[in-house]
Each structure stands twice: as C-alpha cells, then as structure tokens.
C-alpha cells in the first residue's frame, strides 16, 4: 500500500493474451482481498489431510533480476558509489526429509564467519517457499521476528524462479537504507 517496491521494479509494457497492452509495474502475487477466513478454507496441496496450502506456500511469479556486484576498487575506478558491502557468505545443507531447514545451519555458519551475532543483525530476508521455513528457523535461532521479511516474503509477494536471490538482496538493501540499518542477513 505504501509503494515500497516501486523503485525496485522497472515498469514494462506487456501484450496480454487478448492483444491489449498493460504496464507490468508491481508484484503480481499480492492479494489485498484475502482474509484469514479465505486462507483457512483452502484445500491442502499435496495430501488430503496435509497442512500445506496455496495460502502458506509461495506462488511462482514472473521476474527478471539485475544486480551489479563488483569490488570496491572497480566501483571507484568507474566513479560508482557502493550501496552495500558483503561481509560474509556461507553454504549449508540439511536433511531433505526435514525439507527447507538449510537456512538454520547456514545462519549459524555465516554469523560465525562474519563475527556477528543475530542480535547485531538489523533485518533478515528469508527465502521461504513455505511458511514453515521462517517458523522453523525462528524456533532454532530465537530470532526477533519483527526483523524478518518486514515487507512480506515469497508467500506474500511471490517467488520468481531464477530471480529470488536478487529480489531478496534488493529488498534487503532498500529496507536497510530506508530504516538506517547496518547489517542484513539473507538466506
């Protein structure tokens, strides 16, 4: 409603199936007309008695990212001012039986490498394909959820295949700048 993503999306004119044109300038998955009652009425997606529904999993959406990453020296030589600096990276795997829990060991690993604690992190963007991902992560880390996916995650705004990482980076960077935060964590 506030238009926080407006500066992060390049408007593109598209031709619709019926031949008309429209401007694609906002995330297509946002459902402002949803309610808790509508979500509670959705049928399970995978098993008749399952818990995963279209309401607690991300939809596949369109997206094509572009980010420019370079060394500080290169930016200086080109006359560009860096907006952020990557402090550390980490990769971790998890048992596929407990699907989508890899952000838990990855968080511990990257914070250890960066010499930071979770309390020092201002904002967190978790790439959650299902609502259970940040919930499991929070249970293990004890993180303050008021810092997590503060403008909505993939369940709320979409999961563009091949664009998720760049979308998370862009959202995190812009929100850190907007709020004056210093450290962000992206999974």
What are these regions (language model features)?
Residues 1-77, 140-147:
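N-terminal extracellular/periplasmic Venus flytrap/periplasmic-binding protein-like
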Residues 5, 32-35, 57-61, 96, ...:
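Generic structural signal for well-ordered, non-membrane alpha-helical segments
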Residues 118, 139-140, 144-149, 154-187:
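Internal helix-turn-beta structural module
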Residues 14-17, 87-156:
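Active-site pocket-lining segment
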Residues 11, 59, 67-69, 85, ...:
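Structured core elements
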Residues 36-101, 105, 112-114, 170-171, ...:
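Condensing-enzyme catalytic core mediating Claisen C-C bond formation in acyl metabolism
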């Amino acid at each position: 409603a506030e238009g926080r993503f407006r500066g992060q999306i390049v408007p593109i004119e598209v031709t619709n199936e019926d031949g008309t044109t429209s401007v694609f300038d906002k995330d297509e998955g946002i459902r402002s007309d949803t309610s808790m009652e509508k979500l509670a009425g959705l049928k399970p997606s995978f098993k008749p008695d399952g818990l995963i529904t279209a309401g607690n999993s991300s939809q596949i959406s369109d997206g094509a990212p572009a980010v420019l990453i370079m060394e500080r020296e290169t930016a200086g030589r080109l006359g560009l001012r860096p907006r952020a600096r990557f402090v550390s990276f980490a990769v971790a795997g998890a048992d596929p039986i407990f699907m989508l829990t890899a952000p838990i060991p990855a968080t511990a690993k990257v914070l250890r490498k960066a010499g930071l604690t979770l309390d020092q992190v201002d904002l967190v963007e978790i790439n959650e394909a299902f609502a259970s991902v940040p919930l499991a992560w929070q249970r293990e880390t004890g993180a303050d959820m008021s810092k997590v996916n503060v403008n909505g995650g993939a369940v709320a705004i979409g999961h563009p295949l091949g664009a998720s990482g760049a979308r998370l980076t862009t959202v995190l960077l812009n929100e850190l700048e907007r709020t004056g935060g210093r450290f962000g964590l992206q999974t």
